[in-house]
Every structure is written in C-alpha cells, then in structure tokens.
C-alpha cells in the first residue's frame, strides 16, 4: 500500500470549542444543511455516533461520486481532535484503499486554527494523481469556509 499525505491549516474567528462542535461533532447535520450540493445526507449504519460508528454519506450533485462510507476513529473532546477514515464508496475510485482525515482544532487569540492531515492509502503501488489531491484539498477549503460562515451566523445555536 502506498501513502500520500497533505496537511492544511485553516484559521478562523470562530472559537475553538464552537468550531469543534459545529464543524466536526455536528458535521452530519451541518454539512447537508450548508452544502447540500456536496453532501445530501448522512446515514448511520453502525454505532451511536461515537468512536467506531460507521456512516454512509450520500453525496450531492456537485461531485462526480455518489457515496462514501466513513468510520469514526477518534473523538477527543478535551484535545479537540477528531479522526475518521473513508473506508468505502465510489469516492475511493480504483486507486484508493482508504482515506484518513485527522483534525485538531487549536485555540488562538480571537478564534482557532483547524489543522487537517489527510492520508491517502493507495492500493498496491498506485499513485493518486496530484491534480486529484489538489482538487480534494480545494473542495475541502471551500467547504470549511461555507461551514465557518454558517457557524458565525448561527453561534447562538451551538452549545
């Protein structure tokens, strides 16, 4: 299995706790509300939403894919960390075995920084083309900005 990795840091004026809650813990409801063109709905297949939960994400019309199956690996509320692995669905194409997304939300004066490490585990000696990695990174950045705008407009609803 080959491994390709990206690391992205995104600053925000949203507090670390509210970003962690809205962007990561509540992603199953926030993303379809804010970005229905990317994520239509999320269905829990196994588990209760905690570590070990397996979800089926139904993708929207803005993507060429229809589904991705994710498994929640880490929920560390004290450390503001969240990790999930995409383990199935047509989004993995023929090249990928899995994709691990590790998030850590770091508090800053006046907001936070969301650090996202994405690890692409390819099948055999396969290599994911750089343009596909760049495209995925750009879509993630746009999704982050859309969710951030939603959170800024709706902070009163976050615990």
Curated annotation (Swiss-Prot):
Keyword terms, alphabetized: Allergen, Pathogenesis-related protein, Plant defense
A GO BP entry: defense response
Protein name: Major allergen Api g 1, isoallergen 2
Keyword Repressor part of the UniProt annotation: no
GO molecular function: abscisic acid binding; protein phosphatase inhibitor activity; signaling receptor activity
Plastid keyword on record: no
Annotated family: Belongs to the BetVI family.
Gene Ontology CC annotation, any one: nucleus
Pfam families: Bet_v_1
Domain of life: Eukaryota
InterPro entries assigned: Bet_v_I/MLP, Bet_v_I_allergen, Plant_def-hormone_signal, START-like_dom_sf
PROSITE patterns: PATHOGENESIS_BETVI
Annotated source species: Apium graveolens (Celery)
